[in-house]
Amino acid sequence: MAKTLYEKVWDNHIVFAGEGEAPIIYVDRHLVHEVTSPQAFSGLKVAGRKLRAPEKTFATMDHNTSTTSASLDALSPMARTQVETLERNCKEFGVRLYDIHHKNQGIVHVMGPELGITLPGTVIVCGDSHTATHGAFGALAFGIGTSEVEHVMATQTLRQLKAKTMKIEVRGKVADGITAKDIVLAIIGKIGMDGGTGYVVEFCGEAIEALSMEGRMTVCNMAIEMGAKAGMIAPDTTTAEYLEGREFAPKGASWEQAVEAWSQLKTDADAVFDATVVIEAKDIAPQLTWGTNPGQVVAIDQLVPNPLDATNPTVRTSIENALQYVDLTAGTLMTDVSINKVFIGSCTNSRIEDLRAAAVHAKGRKVADGVKAIVVPGSGLVKEQAEAEGLDKIFLEAGFEWRLPGCSMCLAMNDDKLEVGDRCASTSNRNFEGRQGRGSRTHLVSPAMAAAAAVAGHFVDIRKPY
């Protein structure tokens, strides 16, 4: 029977499937951070249980950490309690921890792949909604709740219903300067923030295959923003080249065997998807969100939408509410929208490729008056590589702040928050009301678009001189 990539990985991980019951699947990798793990560890202690597979559990500190200091004294009392609790729990249960002093510490969805923890054909879970990032490697990766975190800790399994399958093909080649972030925002703009609900999405097509692993991670990272359970991309030579030699990747003869096995992880030619979406790559322009969800997105050369153009009353009301919150007027050119904050970072866009793209627009320029711009590398290794290439100096000379790794301004959970009324060009993944701080307005863009906005003081079409 012909199978999709998702179905192959799913079937390989079924431990038990009782009649009329959701199957139990095996979990190969469990990624843990300081926010969603304390209650799970406590549950194990109360029940007197051990951690089932400490060697398959990896922890880091990222959500609440400071990006200005590696000292615990820089943390709020709650944040300090969380990171200290994670440290104690990892020591007690034998979990490998990348703490704030470790050179490999970073955002869980950045440091996992770069260490080779993420491998094709595996099932990966984490108490974080953007776990879909790891699907870029042909893994089945999805976020879970705290009670499920405890269940995985205790059993290394999960009870899960099988999802429907969706193919999203990005046909042809994108124009010069169009990034993975533009591709995925264009996809979400087409199918909406709930268009993938109930599905595991496989991204494919020439434009997807041409992406680096960093770009593929950006695309899969935002699968959840279209409502999907997970996003996946079939592994290929690009995948293998990225993984070879990384710390937790197979070595020697095991490597050759793994690469051979990974070559089978692709959708069969005659497999049938439950839904198919096709996007023409040539039609994708630089994208940015205008509203309060990632589906409210337009191209840089388009106008802020007019709610009167919406025939669906629910959509019309949604547009009206979004415009009121973000304080924009229908019909405004997006290039006329000014910003006063810029955030380059997050599990979506904080890898070395992202920082290089942003540095191109920062080099030899200055951050505009009245604009505060911060650059937050996704991990210690990304920071080290960027500094070796001199990217930090480019940003600093242009007036950007160069920070320590962490989730930072993606979410208002640490000290990197926006103030009421701030308008931010952000490379993160969510532009919900208050996501970056109470009363703040977020516009999702690529790293290049964010850096260009920082120096211009407003959004610009990076395809043209500015």
From Swiss-Prot:
Which InterPro entries has this protein been placed in? 3-IsopropMal_deHydase_lsu, Acnase/IPM_dHydase_lsu_aba_1/3, Acoase/IPM_deHydtase_lsu_aba, Aconitase_4Fe-4S_BS, Aconitase_4Fe-4S_dom, IPM_dehydratase_rel_enz, IPMI_cat
Q: How is the cofactor bound?
A: Binds 1 [4Fe-4S] cluster per subunit.
Part of which pathway? Amino-acid biosynthesis; L-leucine biosynthesis; L-leucine from 3-methyl-2-oxobutanoate: step 2/4
Top-rank taxon: Bacteria
Catalysed conversion reaction: (2R,3S)-3-isopropylmalate = (2S)-2-isopropylmalate
Report TM segments: none
Name the positions where [4Fe-4S] cluster binds.
347, 407, 410
Q: Name one GO molecular function term.
A: 4 iron, 4 sulfur cluster binding
Q: Name one GO biological process term.
A: L-leucine biosynthetic process
* Record's keyword terms, sorted: 4Fe-4S, Amino-acid biosynthesis, Branched-chain amino acid biosynthesis, Iron, Iron-sulfur, Leucine biosynthesis, Lyase, Metal-binding
Q: What is its EC number?
A: 4.2.1.33
- List the cofactors: [4Fe-4S] cluster
Q: What does this protein do?
A: Catalyzes the isomerization between 2-isopropylmalate and 3-isopropylmalate, via the formation of 2-isopropylmaleate.
Q: Describe its assembly.
A: Heterodimer of LeuC and LeuD.
Q: Which family, according to UniProt?
A: Belongs to the aconitase/IPM isomerase family. LeuC type 1 subfamily.
Give the protein's recorded name.
3-isopropylmalate dehydratase large subunit
